[in-house]
Amino acid sequence: MSRPKNQNYKGHGLQKGKEREQRASIRFKTTLMNTLMDVLRHRPGWVEVKDEGEWDFYWCDVSWLRENFDHTYMGEHVRISHFRNHYELTRKNYMVKNLKRFRKQLEREAGKLEAAKCDFFPKTFEMPCEYHLFVEEFRKNPGITWIMKPVARSQGKGIFLFRRLKDIMDWKKGTAGKKLTSLEAQPARNTVNPSGSHDTRSSDDQKDEIPVENYVAQRYIENPYLIGGRKFDLRVYVLVMSYIPLRAWLYRDGFARFSNTRFTLNSIDDQYVHLTNVAVQKTSPDYHPKKGCKWMLQRFRQYLASKHGPEAVETLFSDMDNIFIRSLQSVQKVIISDKHCFELYGYDILIDQDLKPWLLEVNASPSLTASSQEDYELKTCLLEDTLHIVDMEARLTGREKRVGGFDLMWNDGPVSREEGGPDLSGMGNFVTNTHLGCVNDRKEQLRQLFRSLQGQKKTPN
């Protein structure tokens, strides 16, 4: 159980074994009234706890975590949906700092070739503290396009593109050091799921609120891969159960998010051309939710294979695997790896014309609000499989390489796709145990998995 530390603590969460066995239900709590609530309420043996009731499982928002984590006692069995300092990866400026540091570390320890595997994020400067470094870089490469992003906002708010130094000078005079209002830092409210429930918090990815607004200035990818003349990015889901040792799962499904307007560099002020966020696109005058602003990753992978062949697609998706692992390794030593914590990250990836993937950002609270029935089904399955891996029911053995739509890609080292394969990625025909954009026969896999686990329980050792 969990309980605030400042209350009269009498061993909550450390009940005797017999008492624990008698309590069959798992008490959950969440502040998110979206697809997640639907999944939690329909999970057998799980009961909702409201207000200050004691809980075993809490899918919280990042604001609750910041205000309460350090003051809450959690028993051995309790699980919570964020790592304490998740922002080391999910704040844009911290993510870049950690990746730059990790790249330098790799260059010292393993050489430039290994360090080059971290070259998957555009040249970036934190503003205003690296303003003079940015100006120096800007003058070396005049005429290119840059994109300015606030480090702690979501839904495309505060983002703008520029090519003139005057634009950034005006920004520095008028915006640097501006304090965020609570309204600016929080997502929109009162959206509705296909299930009919209202989402009061996460209509899009939640971000940390910070007292002073910082930005990152990032070199804009001017040659994005286009489909039908439109720009898109990919949303991919990675589940981390532990940082020490690093244990990470990759979900097979995800989606491509398209802009509503054909791409051009002639109108850098048009957000409908350059920003693919659903929150931005749905404000477009000609937006229609059924027009095709999202593709499932399986469709996207098939499209690329038909255009470029399966070998090129395998290389692209292998490069994305590298992004997931290297980014997690970059924060492995700074994230507080509390055994009570897990995290479902939403990775945003951009593909350029050379089929090179670029990491745009990592979201600590990827939107769980559905924009269509297909989106609702994806997120429902994603959350169900996340709960299977968190395993509050203690059904798994810990040796599983696949659970539903999740594949174990890293377990204190790379995981081989084939049984009996080598343990080191530099050996032989090693193929990482990932299947992003492949067939997701999760229902059949779960049926076989739990039947096998049930059989193991019945068989005496």
From Swiss-Prot:
Point to the regions of Basic and acidic residues compositional bias. Answer: 198-208
User: Where, in this chain's numbering, is ATP bound?
Assistant: K149, Q155, G156, Q218, R219, Y220, I221, K231, F232, D233, T276, N277
Q: What's a GO biological-process term for it?
A: flagellated sperm motility
Q: What SUPFAM superfamilies does its record include?
A: Glutathione synthetase ATP-binding domain-like
Protein's job:
Probable tubulin polyglutamylase that generates side chains of glutamate on the gamma-carboxyl group of specific glutamate residues within the C-terminal tail of target proteins. Similar to TTLL1, may acquire enzymatic activity only in complex with other proteins as it is most likely lacking domains important for autonomous activity. Mediates tubulin polyglutamylation which induces establishment of microtubule heterogeneity in sperm flagella, thereby playing a role in normal motile flagella axoneme structure and sperm flagella beating pattern.
- The EC number on file is 6.3.2.-
**For binding a protein, which residues are annotated in this chain's numbering?**
Q155
Family (UniProt):
Belongs to the tubulin--tyrosine ligase family.
- Residues where Mg(2+) 1 binds: D348, E361
Q: Where is this region: Disordered?
A: 1-21, 182-208
Q: Where does the record place Polar residues bias?
A: 188-197
Keywords, alphabetical: ATP-binding, Cell projection, Cilium, Cytoplasm, Cytoskeleton, Flagellum, Ligase, Magnesium, Metal-binding, Microtubule, Nucleotide-binding
Q: GO molecular function, one example?
A: metal ion binding
Instruction: Give cofactor(s), names only.
Output: Mg(2+)
Q: Where is this site: Essential for specifying alpha-elongation versus initiation step of the polyglutamylase activity?
A: Q155
From the UniProt record, list the reaction(s) this protein catalyses.
(L-glutamyl)(n)-gamma-L-glutamyl-L-glutamyl-[protein] + L-glutamate + ATP = (L-glutamyl)(n+1)-gamma-L-glutamyl-L-glutamyl-[protein] + ADP + phosphate + H(+)
Which residues are involved in binding Mg(2+) 2? E361, N363
State where the protein is found.
Cytoplasm, Cytoskeleton, Cilium basal body; Cytoplasm, Cytoskeleton; Cytoplasm, Cytoskeleton, Flagellum axoneme
Which residues does UniProt call coiled coil? Answer: none
What name appears for this protein in its UniProt entry? Answer: Probable tubulin polyglutamylase TTLL9
Domain-related comment: Gln-155 is the main determinant for regioselectivity, which segregates between initiases and elongases in all tubulin--tyrosine ligase family. A glutamine residue at this position is found in elongases TTLL6, TTLL9, TTLL11, TTLL13, TTLL10 and favors glutamate-chain elongation, whereas an arginine residue is found in initiases TTLL2, TTLL4, TTLL5, TTLL3, TTLL8 and favors initiation.
The source's domain of life comes to Eukaryota
